[in-house]
């Protein structure tokens, strides 16, 4: 919490499998720069895991809209959304639903899929698997010494029991559908945007990011981090990324 009235109000939206603590380091860093950053466990994650089941796009987006509306009521100004991976897709869809309450969105390795090779073929395969074996689990390998992540983030993602490490097939299909929705609706987005992407991102294909850049056009800025991982806000360069976000927020604030 910054001293006095914050210069900007920011809502953090975490990635798939993660929870609100994804912003525990960035929150104080923002506060030191006069900004309020708040986050929460999105439906189906953290303290709200629902045994790993997918909460659904409608609930995820409506909760983000509710949170930003509450911040608007309290601080009487539009807020910013900072979304990582899944959180980026949620940010796109929430901004479309409440454009007057959102001053801008920051999309860090957002879950988007437009233009990827064999997109609909993969969809058919994943949908079939989710229908046949919805509870089948995919294991996510998370190492406490992952060099692609900041030390505190690597430990949290590997050791905190609130992090999902075994992903249900139907939840994975839900994530794919959410990413498709964000991709399909992105051309309608008019909100100022900052798009961030890492050269070591093995989760979101570059084709999806390039199509999103085209849709954002002159309403969006883009930053590329050659050594950046998929989870840019958890990476070793997280403070550099945070500085770029702070600079953009300062220039974009109404």
Please provide the spans of the model-predicted regions:
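Catalytic active-site module of serine/aspartate enzymes centered on a nucleophile-bearing elbow/loop
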Residues: 219-254
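Alpha/beta-hydrolase fold nucleophile elbow
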Residues: 75-85
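The serine-hydrolase catalytic nucleophile loop
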Residues: 16-28
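Conserved alpha/beta-hydrolase
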Residues: 27-51
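Catalytic nucleophile-loop/oxyanion-hole region of alpha/beta-hydrolase
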Residues: 17-20, 45-75
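Short beta-strand/loop motif that positions the catalytic acidic residue
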Residues: 189, 195-197, 201
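Short alpha-helix in the alpha/beta-hydrolase fold that links the catalytic acid
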Residues: 191, 205-214
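Alpha/beta-hydrolase-fold enzymes
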Residues: 84-168
